[in-house]
Amino acid sequence: MNLDLYSDRAKQAVQSAQSLALARRHQQFAPEHLLKVLLEERDGLARNLITAAGGDAKRAEADVETALSKRAQVSGGSGQLYLDGDTARVFAAAEAASKKAGDAFVTTERLLSALAREGGVAKTVLAAAGAKPDDLDAAILEIRKGK
């Protein structure tokens, strides 16, 4: 993952997700952390995309919180955070989708779409909330008006 390829907003989301993982004393940076942060964005872009894709953003938010509460916590140690394999796949998928679309940077929309495709537990949360990857991609195109 090369953060230079990410928009400022996407960088901030990644950093906030890492901070969330550390604050909750989780040893791994998982896709659920990123989904939680995206769902809490002030302007509600992720929530709006999930709704536009036919999903239930409130259910996704509740389910991701449940998933995070089930993650093992560690105490002591160096506060080292490890990248979960699913998270690495999410970043790779977001970068590939951005490149394919001709985007200059990886955006939060592409991160959300990648979570729905590659996000492990976050993928399951989004699917249970009714947010399918292809529908999210269509919602992204609609919001961007093809840009």
Indicate where each model-derived feature is located.
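Histone-fold recognition with a strong bias for associated Lys/Arg-rich disordered tails
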Residues: 1-147
